Amino acid sequence: MIVLNSKPLIIGLSHLGQIFSVGWASKYGKCSVFDTNNERLNAFKQGNLAKEERFLISSYKKNKNKISFLKDKKEILSYKNIFITIDTPIDHVGKPDYDYLFEFILNLKPCFPQESNIIIYSQVYPGFSRRLLKDVFVDRKDISLVYMVETLRLGNALHEFKYPKKIIFGIDKNKFPQILNKFSCKKFIFNYETAEIYKAAVNIYLFFSVSFANLIDNFCRENNSSYQDLVAPLRLDKRIGKYSYIQASLGISGGHLERDINSIENNFNNHISKKIIYYLKKNDQNRINLLKKKIKKISLNQTIGNVLWVGASYKKEAFSESNTPLSKYIFRNKNIQQLFVYDSFFNLKKKKYKIIKNLKEFNYKKVLIIFNYASLKDIKIIKRIVAKFNCAIIDISINSALRKIIKDSINIYD
């Protein structure tokens, strides 16, 4: 009888796999990693990790000696506990590609040894695990398939992986792998569907909170009121809470909430419930029109030849260009000739805009600045640009230091 290696094998080294492997090595000890994508695998070997995650790179360097690298997928046959940690891809509006994940697992199937534990940590839709049992593992009754819910927040994911308050698992026929007892926090063990719906439920709740804020903001605009004035007292209501997602915005972005919203909408059979989500999405998508109206108002008094967008991601703590205010702006302004983009924290790849690498060198007249986020140092440079060109600046950020430094900035939410 072949004795399998019991230490975890982590397959899929996108953001999620990086967090899992480094977090495991840091807290629990030795692990092995692999990825069928050589670019991701080599980047991980070289320590080119997600820069937006605090302490991830330093923790990797400290614990790299605990991480072993597989050279070939045939080596997977030696491992009993296999974690699938590839991030489910999303497009520019947050639509998930679950077929990619399905094919990723299907192609690995011949490498899964007898009596192995396959733990899915990737983002899935309700019914995905059952589909794997039916369409992939129907002839592999020896395999124990587990779905482990991922609820990590970008920017703080490593800490949350190492110190979870709870973990939800979906299992079949009470098959719970011993290795999962390494996690000493509160565990909730459900069937596949309940665990999968929990993950979706969290994001749907957050989506409804954002929708509430934007809905009331719309109502305030029609009734000579400011929603911004309501946020602080709303947070003091214990039924709402200080950590609630009730800040008005230009709509959800980043792709992570959108992934589950799209999944729930597509899998709902109840017509009324499906319509509720549909119209909330419509309201969310229309929020970008606030920016369009501000720009139109400014253009009545100022010729706008160039636009400088500061802060390309959906937030400064984590990088994603999926469904961001910038991507929405580009989608609705396809004919714009001069769009410049600068980011204080992330290296940008050339897209449909011109990348500014040094704000001090920006020297374009007739410019409108749209501010999302920036470092304090760069905000001071922006102040000098505003003074030099006498240009308008629209602040679309939720909370920033900009308004304290540039008094004439136009708040999108006022």
Which residues does each predicted region cover?
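Structural/interface elements that position substrates and couple domains in central-metabolism enzymes
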Residues: 1-414
